[in-house]
């Protein structure tokens, strides 16, 4: 009998109950007991969903009040010492302070969970870190499930992955030195689970899918030799990529089973079957835990039947990874197009699919004939639907030539024409795009969406906001202006709503971090632009000023990365379709008199595959998509792009290949350290290193920004430098925004004056600046939350 199980379930609730309970607790409107009660209700509901579908075990320990890595850090007792907390007496208030900071300490660093759009809290380790245990919440959850008569299978992030994802602020400290102490902490956890009669524990080790150095591979041997003595059977789970190259070594570990991701890496099945010990189970992730499309159940059954014949009861079935990454249920999607809805499966529906697969294997296809027929119908509907494949899009895509991704002239020639056309001063000042989204702006958009105000009144209100933004920028003395984006709820949904091939859910929320949830749009078919999206707004904004007004667009890779993407064609193909749609908008903006056009790509690095061997292929099509979107304009039109919170050094050749005339980046928190890579690489185009951190309400002084600009000039010649904040300003208030921008303009003018006094437009390149004293860049490798898709 094949067993069925899941690796984890979304914790937010189908109506985002956890989010609202968290935020009420933070406001002081709910007690800790009330928050705990909401959490317990959600856990029971989610376990019951699994039990009702006949799953052999229910996942426990996958719940977290904020983040599973933070909860494991608390369970181990490895809290950052700077907070001065007693792990054994940790309260929920203190737990949340670790994630959100307090008056004395900033929050723990947050970054992306592998290549997903979920963020985790990064453990802070050093030689003094101990793993003596913390609150008993993890065990209490297992007790809750056992008390309900359920077969609990607790879920733990494995010790090697935990160390891999941690960091140390002590230079040269080897995190692996902590492995022996860490394993003692894990053994105590497993001992307590064994004492409760737990048969199986799921140990997640997605790090096994990465490029690991020998010392880290050796750590797996050490870790599982130690944990074997603890008692419960261990299911070692990998996901997000192939672990086939480590299959032989992993199979020798003293564990009782393995989980592999056959959605992301179906080719690894043969290697794992060949390596699997005779005693071990093999859990196959055959339902996509990261996307929302229904599974082709017959195709999966064709894959599973030979495996079942070989393994018998040692075959387990599961989604590819935790269902954390998909919405909870389709039940509340009452307005979603009926045909599109029939193609989708959220977490609850994926439980149904898993149940069907298990019953088909363990009984017969006849028992689930109706469900298999429905699956067949959904697949046939997608293949035949006229909304999916658009001949004119396919024809246009086929006609794309390599030369279409190239500007007419090289940068050295373009920039001279742009300088002549734009007549900007040395060190031109600008912002990244958005201005404060006031309550009045949000209310206007909501009223229009509800039909409470008409299109004309909505347009008048938005134009009034644009006029305010333009006046404020002129008064501040900025050189290149923006319209402020008052009409945009976010940088992906706004464009997706105007592109064919996109769909939108009402309740398709997914946790990004803590209480922050995102509702990604759905790319279901060929993408094209039926009409201009931003041209009228940009034209109006430009009419209010003589200064250059930037057109503001989201790039094709960010549109792709922050959506649920169709799975019936390569992502590269969808990216090219998006690029052509954006290209049309870029050309129309130019025709409307917009001389500076920004195409934001904060998610470019997020798309990198986990294995470096796969990077070149991704970067090739991603960079080509950007170039295709940007290259239809004349030399005089200046193309900007923006990237934030990223480590660029290992992909600088690809960034240079994008050939944007100006790139703006986040650098203020790292005291311009990030810029050094651009200098060492001799980045050829213009660059705007952010001179102040928009994520902080603190208004930086003129002197502080001057120091950052001085440092920037040591790396990049001043004639190629722009002056700008780190990111968009939508999350800030107007008072702090105006004060910070006024200081920024003053800093730029002061440096211009100093350069002018020397009669110089160049700056002698000094030796590398001393190491920064600023905190390390958070979200390394990821877009910042100010650039994230619409969240709530």
Curated annotation (Swiss-Prot):
Keywords: Amino-acid biosynthesis, Metal-binding, Methionine biosynthesis, Methyltransferase, Repeat, Transferase, Zinc. InterPro entries: Cbl-indep_Met_Synth_N (IPR013215), Cobalamin-indep_Met_synthase (IPR006276), Met_Synth_C/arc (IPR002629), UROD/MetE-like_sf (IPR038071). It catalyses: 5-methyltetrahydropteroyltri-L-glutamate + L-homocysteine = tetrahydropteroyltri-L-glutamate + L-methionine. The active site is at 695 (proton donor). Pfam families: Meth_synt_1, Meth_synt_2. 5-methyltetrahydropteroyltri-L-glutamate binds at residues 16-19, 112, 516-517, 562, 606. Binds 1 zinc ion per subunit. It comes from the Bacteria. Zn(2+) binds at residues 642, 644, 666, 727. Its cofactor is Zn(2+). GO terms for biological process: methionine biosynthetic process; methylation. L-homocysteine binds at residues 432-434, 485, 600. L-methionine binds at residues 432-434, 485, 600. Pathway: Amino-acid biosynthesis; L-methionine biosynthesis via de novo pathway; L-methionine from L-homocysteine (MetE route): step 1/1. It is an enzyme of class 2 (transferase). Its EC number is 2.1.1.14. GO terms for molecular function: 5-methyltetrahydropteroyltriglutamate-homocysteine S-methyltransferase activity; zinc ion binding. SUPFAM superfamilies: UROD/MetE-like (SSF51726). Belongs to the vitamin-B12 independent methionine synthase family. Catalyzes the transfer of a methyl group from 5-methyltetrahydrofolate to homocysteine resulting in methionine formation. This is 5-methyltetrahydropteroyltriglutamate--homocysteine methyltransferase. It comes from Cupriavidus necator. The gene is metE.
């Amino acid at each position: 009998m094949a067993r069925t199980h899941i690796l984890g379930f979304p914790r937010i609730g189908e109506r985002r109950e956890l989010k609202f309970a968290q935020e009420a607790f933070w406001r002081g409107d709910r007690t800790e007991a009330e928050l705990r009660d909401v959490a317990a209700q959600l856990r029971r509901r989610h376990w019951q969903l699994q039990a009702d579908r006949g799953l052999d075990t229910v996942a426990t320990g996958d719940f977290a009040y904020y983040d599973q890595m933070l909860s494991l850090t608390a369970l181990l007792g490895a809290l950052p010492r700077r907070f001065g907390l007693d792990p054994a007496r940790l309260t929920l208030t203190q737990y949340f302070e670790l994630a959100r900071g307090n008056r004395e300490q900033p929050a723990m660093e947050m970054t992306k969970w592998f290549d997903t759009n979920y963020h985790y809290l990064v453990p802070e380790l050093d030689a003094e870190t101990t793993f003596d245990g913390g609150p008993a919440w993890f065990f209490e959850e297992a007790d809750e499930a056992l008390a309900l008569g359920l077969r609990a299978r607790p879920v733990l992030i494995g010790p090697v992955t935990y160390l891999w994802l941690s960091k140390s602020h002590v230079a040269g400290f080897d995190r692996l030195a902590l492995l022996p102490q860490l394993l003692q902490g894990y053994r105590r956890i497993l001992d307590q689970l064994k004492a409760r009669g737990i048969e199986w524990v799921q140990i997640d080790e997605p790090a096994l899918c990465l490029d690991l150095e020998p010392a880290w591979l050796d750590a797996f041997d050490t870790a599982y030799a130690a944990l074997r003595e603890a008692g419960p059977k261990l299911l070692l789970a990998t996901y997000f990529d192939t672990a086939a190259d480590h299959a032989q070594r992993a199979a020798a570990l003293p564990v009782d089973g393995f989980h592999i991701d056959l959605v992301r890496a179906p080719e690894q099945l043969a290697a794992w079957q060949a390596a699997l010990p005779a005693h071990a189970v093999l859990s196959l992730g055959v339902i996509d835990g990261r996307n929302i499309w229904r599974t082709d159940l017959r195709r999966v059954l064709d894959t599973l039947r030979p495996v079942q014949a070989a393994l018998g009861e040692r075959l387990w079935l599961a989604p590819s990874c935790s269902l954390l990454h998909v919405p909870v249920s389709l039940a509340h999607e009452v307005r979603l197009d009926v045909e599109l809805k029939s193609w989708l499966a959220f977490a609850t529906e994926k439980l149904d699919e898993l149940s069907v697969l298990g019953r088909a294997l363990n009984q017969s296809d006849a028992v689930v004939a109706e469900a298999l027929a429905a699956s067949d119908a959904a697949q046939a509907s997608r293949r035949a639907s006229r909304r999916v494949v658009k001949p004119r899009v396919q024809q246009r895509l086929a006609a794309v030539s390599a030369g279409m991704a190239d500007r007419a002239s090289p940068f050295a020639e373009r920039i001279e024409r742009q300088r002549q056309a734009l007549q900007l001063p040395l060190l031109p000042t600008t912002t990244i795009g958005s201005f404060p989204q006031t309550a009045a702006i949000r209310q206007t958009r909501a009223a229009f969406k509800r039909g409470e105000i008409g299109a004309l009144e909505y347009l008048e209100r938005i134009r009034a906001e644009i006029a305010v933004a333009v006046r404020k920028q002129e008064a501040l003395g900025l050189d290149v202006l923006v319209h402020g984006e008052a009409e945009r709820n976010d940088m992906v949904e706004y464009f997706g709503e105007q592109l064919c091939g996109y769909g939108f859910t009402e309740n398709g929320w997914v946790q990004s971090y803590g209480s922050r949830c995102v509702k990604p749009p759905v790319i279901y078919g060929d993408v094209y632009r039926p009409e201009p999206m931003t041209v009228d707004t940009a034209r109006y904004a430009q009419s209010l000023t003589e200064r250059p007004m930037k057109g503001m667009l989201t790039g094709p890779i960010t549109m792709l990365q922050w959506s649920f993407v169709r799975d019936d064609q390569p992502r590269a193909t969808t990216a090219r379709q998006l690029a052509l749609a954006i290209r049309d908008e870029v050309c129309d903006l130019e025709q409307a008199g917009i001389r500076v056009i920004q195409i934001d790509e904060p998610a470019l690095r997020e798309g990198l595959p986990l294995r470096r061997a796969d990077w070149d292929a991704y970067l090739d099509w991603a960079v080509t998509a950007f170039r295709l979107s940007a290259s239809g304009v004349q030399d005089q039109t200046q193309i900007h792009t923006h990237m934030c919170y990223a480590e660029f050094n290992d992909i600088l050749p690809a960034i240079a290949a994008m050939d944007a005339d100006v790139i703006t980046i986040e650098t203020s928190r790292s005291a311009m350290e990030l810029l050094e890579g651009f200098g060492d690489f001799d980045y050829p185009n213009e660059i705007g290193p952010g001179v102040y951190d928009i994520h902080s309400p603190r208004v930086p002084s003129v002197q502080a920004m001057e120091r950052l600009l001085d440092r920037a000039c040591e790396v990049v010649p001043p004639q190629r430098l722009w002056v700008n904040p780190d990111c968009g300003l939508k999350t800030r208030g107007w008072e702090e925004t105006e004060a910070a921008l006024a200081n920024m303009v003053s800093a730029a003018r002061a440096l211009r004056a100093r350069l002018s006094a020397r009669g110089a437009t160049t700056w002698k390149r000094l030796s590398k600046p001393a190491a920064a004293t600023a905190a390390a860049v958070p979200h390394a490798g990821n877009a910042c939350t100010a650039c994230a898709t619409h969240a709530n």
